[in-house]
């Protein structure tokens, strides 16, 4: 009942920070000896951590699709980039039904990769580089404004919604962690310019600056911050679909609403929002395929990992890879950390499960069954 009350009475703001290429392998939190994310490692101690979460793909649009639409990756193009990508039942739908404003904030130009079309078509107000006054853009790259500038925009929007007493859900997509790896000087400690290490340290610094700035705001106590990634920095490896190259953080920080804790169960990027909604007691009807991990029976955990061509499905420590021309390969996963695989005979039941999940996502999309209205 306590949990139900968070939603029915308080309607917290939900701020989902999708960090460009924030691989768990950069973080002390996930065992890196010389951490690149000292601030996030520290923040995680006061947060609820889902420590075993995997991205569905290798592209930003896939990550945004997983977080917003909560479906496995469809073969070929991401739904975000397809023509009929509006009017879908996304994570914002149940929130708008109870009076929320939903927004998508992006540090670059949102027409890139069809993001504006997708988010606008699904009821999100767009705030991107074009909404930031030129004089405030003291640093940018070809990809977008420095992350700290994007986070300042988020705070301004949350201030506005607080004044009109409208709860708000934001999906924020950062851009600084891209080549050429340049970022504002003199902010993050020990951050070398032009190197991935430097830019990750800068982004880490800017997220915690954002949260510290938010702490002085009247809406802070009633705001939930979710920090995750769109994908890993590289999914190339010795083996096809190396599972360790898909591991991403999922940190939920809301000191007044959610007790710190940790859940180590295997979890997909498509499960993040359904799980969060479960934590704060939002009950809603959904057409999506993500699980609330806290309500899922043991043994039913499954994840999806994909590239443009290959679709991987992992269940009970076995990986099935479906590739074009109906080729199927099956592996036993001996080690998630190093992607240690042993090839095994195909398991017809597991193959069927994989095919069913992937075909269902395509079927629902193609037949307009992911739409909000029948």
Residue ranges: model-predicted function:
Residues 1-288, 297-308:
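Soluble catalytic regions of membrane-associated enzymes that act on cell-envelope
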Residues 258-374:
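Membrane-interface soluble catalytic domains
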């Amino acid at each position: 009942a306590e949990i139900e009350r968070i939603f029915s009475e308080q309607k917290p703001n939900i701020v989902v920070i999708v960090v460009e290429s924030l691989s768990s392998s950069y973080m002390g939190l996930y065992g890196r000896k010389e951490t690149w994310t000292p601030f996030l490692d520290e923040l995680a101690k006061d947060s609820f951590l889902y420590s075993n979460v995997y991205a569905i793909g290798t592209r930003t649009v896939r990550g945004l699709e997983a977080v917003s639409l909560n479906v496995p990756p469809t073969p070929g193009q991401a739904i975000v980039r397809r023509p009929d990508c509006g009017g879908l039942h996304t994570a914002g739908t149940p929130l708008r039904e109870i009076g929320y404003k939903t927004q998508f904030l992006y540090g670059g130009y949102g027409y890139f990769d069809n993001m504006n079309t997708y988010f606008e078509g699904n009821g999100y107000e767009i705030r991107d580089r074009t909404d930031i006054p030129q004089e405030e853009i003291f640093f940018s790259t070809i990809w977008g404004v420095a992350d700290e500038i994007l986070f300042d925009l988020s705070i301004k929007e949350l201030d506005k919604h607080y004044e009109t007493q409208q709860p708000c859900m934001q999906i924020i997509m950062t851009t600084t962690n891209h080549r050429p790896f340049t970022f504002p000087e003199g902010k993050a400690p020990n951050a070398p310019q032009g190197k991935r290490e430097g830019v990750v340290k800068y982004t880490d610094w800017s997220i915690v600056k954002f949260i510290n700035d938010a702490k002085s705001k009247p809406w802070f106590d009633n705001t939930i911050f979710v920090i995750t990634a769109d994908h890993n920095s590289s999914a190339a490896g010795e083996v096809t679909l190396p599972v360790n190259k898909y591991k991403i953080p999922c940190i939920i920080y809301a000191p007044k609403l959610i007790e710190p804790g940790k859940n180590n169960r295997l979890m997909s990027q498509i499960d993040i929002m359904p799980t969060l909604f479960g934590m704060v007691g939002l009950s809603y009807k959904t057409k999506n395929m993500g699980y609330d991990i806290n309500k899922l029976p043991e043994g039913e955990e499954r994840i999806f990992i994909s590239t443009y061509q290959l679709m991987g499905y992992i269940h009970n420590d076995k990986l099935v890879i479906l590739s074009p021309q109906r080729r199927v390969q099956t592996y036993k996963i001996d080690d998630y950390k190093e992607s240690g695989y042993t090839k095994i005979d195909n398991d017809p039941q597991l193959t069927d499960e994989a095919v069913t999940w992937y075909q269902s996502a395509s079927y629902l999309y193609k037949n307009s069954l992911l739409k909000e209205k029948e």
